[in-house]
From Swiss-Prot:
Subcellular location: Cytoplasm
Native source organism of the sequence: Enterobacter sp. (strain 638)
UniProt entry keywords in alphabetical sequence: Cytoplasm, GTP-binding, Ligase, Magnesium, Metal-binding, Nucleotide-binding, Purine biosynthesis
UniProt name for this protein: Adenylosuccinate synthetase
Family matches, as InterPro entries: Adenylosuccin_syn_GTP-bd, Adenylosuccin_syn_Lys_AS, Adenylosuccinate_synth_dom1, Adenylosuccinate_synth_dom2, Adenylosuccinate_synth_dom3, Adenylosuccinate_synthetase, P-loop_NTPase
Residues annotated for IMP binding in this entry: 14-17, 39-42, 130, 144, 225, 240, 304
PANTHER family given in the database record: ADENYLOSUCCINATE SYNTHETASE
Length: 432
C-alpha cells in the first residue's frame, strides 16, 4: 500500500493532472503542491461544473481534504486572493482547508514587470512565459534576496527588505529595459492588506507531512506543468523555472525522498506544447488541427492555442527514467476517435542520419530532428465516457498495449472524458 502518491505530467504540461488528482483525493487526507506557481492551470469538471485552479491544490473542493502549498511554490498574494474569492463565493471554505509553508517565495508586482519586460526584449527569441513573474521570483529565491511568506510576521522588517529589493529591480526596469518603475508604496500596501490572511494559514509543512506519514494518512503530491519543462531535465532554455520532476517533491515540500511510495505519470494520448521550444512530432496539417479542435487545446491559464502532434514515446521514456514512474494514467484517448490511423514516435533521425531512441537535453540539439513513426490502425467507435476496459475498441486496446510495451510502464488509469466519473482505475495508486 502506498501512502504518499505523486501525480505529475510526463510531457510539456496540460496532460490532465487536475482531474486525476481530484479523483484520487477521494482517499487522501492531504493534497500538496510542491513547485510552480499560478502559471499552472488545472481544470476540474464535477457534475458538469467546471473549475479552473492555478495555485490552490485540486483537493480544495473536497471537505475532508487539507490542501497545502509547499515551500517549492512561488506564491502570488494577488493571485491567491482572487482564486480564494472565486471559491468562497461558491461556498467553499478555503481558509479552513488551505495551509501554506512560510518558506514560499512571494511573487510581487515587480516580478511580473520584469517577466514582461524581458520577454519583450527577447523579441523573436521569446521563451513564451506566461508573464506572471514566476521566473523572476525563483531568480530572487536563488539569489537570496526574495521575500517569503514568513517575512510577513514582522511587517516593519518586511517593509525594509521590500524597499531594498525594489530599488535593485527598478534600476533594471528603468535603465536596462526602458520600462516604468514599479511603485513601492502600492506594492507594500497591497501585500500588507492580505498579510494576516497569509500568515494565518502558515504551518510547518515538513513536520505535518512527517506526522501524517507516521499515522499512515494518505497524501497526494500534485505536480504542475510537465517533466519536459523541468528547469534541469527539460528542453532548456524553453522550460519553466522549477523542478517539475518527482525529485521536486522532496525539496519542494520537505518530505523525505524515501517516503514516496508511488509516482503516477499523466500521459496524454497525443502530444501538446504551449509556447516556443522543440516539438519533433508537431503536426501542421489537418490532423494537427483535428487534435486541437477535438481536444479543446487552449491553455487554461493563458488561453493560448496549444501546438499538437503525435505521441512522442521517446520523450515520455525520458520522463519514465527521471521520475522512476510506477504507472501511467492515459488521458484524452477519446480525442483520437475517428482517425483512420494513429502514430507513435519511437525514435529520432538526427541531421547526420543516425537513429537514436533517447532525447537530447539542450534545445539546440533538437534542431533538425525527424521523428521515426510506428503506424497503427485507428478506430471509428467512440471511447468517450467508456467506464470499463472491455468497452474499448480493440484498436484502442492495441494502442494502449503498445504504449505499455514501448515504455515498460503499466497504464493503471484511463481517462475517457473530463468528468470525474469518466475514468477507469485499473490499479489504485494507494493500493499499489
Amino acid at each position: 500500500m502506498g501512502n504518499n502518491v505523486v501525480v505529475l505530467g510526463t510531457q510539456w504540461g496540460d496532460e490532465g493532472k487536475g482531474k486525476i488528482v481530484d479523483l484520487l483525493t477521494e482517499r487522501a487526507k492531504y493534497v500538496v503542491r510542491y513547485q510552480g506557481g499560478h502559471n499552472a492551470g488545472h481544470t476540474l469538471v464535477i457534475n458538469g461544473e467546471k473549475t479552473v485552479l492555478h495555485l490552490i491544490p485540486s483537493g480544495i473542493l473536497r471537505d475532508n481534504v487539507t490542501s497545502i502549498i509547499g515551500n517549492g511554490v512561488v506564491l502570488s498574494p494577488a493571485a491567491l486572493m482572487k482564486e480564494m474569492k472565486g471559491l468562497e463565493d461558491r461556498g467553499i471554505p478555503v481558509r479552513e482547508r488551505l495551509l501554506l509553508s512560510e518558506a514560499c517565495p512571494l511573487i510581487l508586482d515587480y516580478h511580473v514587470a520584469l517577466d514582461v519586460a524581458r520577454e519583450k526584449a527577447r523579441g523573436a527569441k521569446a521563451i513564451g512565459t506566461t508573464g506572471r513573474g514566476i521566473g523572476p521570483a525563483y531568480e530572487d529565491k536563488v539569489a537570496r534576496r526574495g521575500l517569503r511568506v514568513g517575512d510577513l510576521f514582522d511587517k516593519a522588517t518586511f517593509a525594509d527588505k521590500l524597499k531594498e529589493v525594489m530599488e535593485y529591480h527598478n534600476f533594471q526596469l528603468v535603465n536596462f529595459y526602458k520600462a516604468d518603475a514599479v511603485d513601492y508604496q502600492k506594492v507594500l500596501d497591497d501585500v500588507m492588506a492580505v498579510a494576516d490572511i497569509l500568515t494565518g494559514m502558515v504551518v510547518d509543512v515538513s513536520d505535518l507531512l512527517d506526522q501524517a506519514r507516521k499515522r499512515g494518512d494518505f497524501v497526494m503530491f500534485e505536480g504542475a506543468q510537465g517533466t519536459l519543462l523541468d528547469i534541469d531535465h527539460g528542453t532548456y532554455p524553453y522550460v519553466t523555472s522549477s523542478n517539475t520532476t518527482a525529485g521536486g517533491v522532496a525539496t519542494g515540500s520537505g518530505l523525505g525522498p524515501r517516503y514516496v511510495d508511488y509516482v503516477l505519470g499523466i500521459i496524454k494520448a497525443y502530444s501538446t506544447r504551449v509556447g516556443a521550444g522543440p516539438f519533433p512530432t508537431e503536426l501542421f496539417d489537418d490532423i494537427g488541427e483535428f487534435l486541437c479542435k477535438q481536444g479543446n487545446e487552449f491553455g487554461a491559464t493563458t488561453g493560448r492555442r496549444r501546438r499538437t502532434g503525435w505521441l512522442d514515446v521517446v520523450a515520455v521514456r525520458r520522463a519514465v527514467q527521471i521520475n522512476s514512474l510506477s504507472g501511467f494514467c492515459l488521458t484524452k484517448l477519446d480525442v483520437l476517435d475517428g482517425l483512420k490511423e494513429v502514430k507513435l514516435c519511437i525514435g529520432y533521425r538526427m541531421p547526420d542520419g543516425r537513429e537514436v531512441t533517447t532525447t537530447p537535453l539542450a534545445a539546440d540539439d533538437w534542431e533538425g530532428i525527424e521523428p521515426i513513426y510506428e503506424t497503427m490502425p485507428g478506430w471509428s467507435e467512440t471511447t468517450f465516457g467508456v467506464k470499463a476496459r472491455s468497452g474499448l475498441p480493440q484498436a484502442a486496446l492495441d494502442y494502449i498495449k503498445r504504449i505499455e510495451e514501448l515504455t515498460e510502464v503499466p497504464i493503471d488509469i484511463i481517462s475517457t472524458g473530463p468528468d470525474r466519473s469518466e475514468t477507469m482505475i485499473l490499479r489504485d495508486p494507494f493500493d499499489a
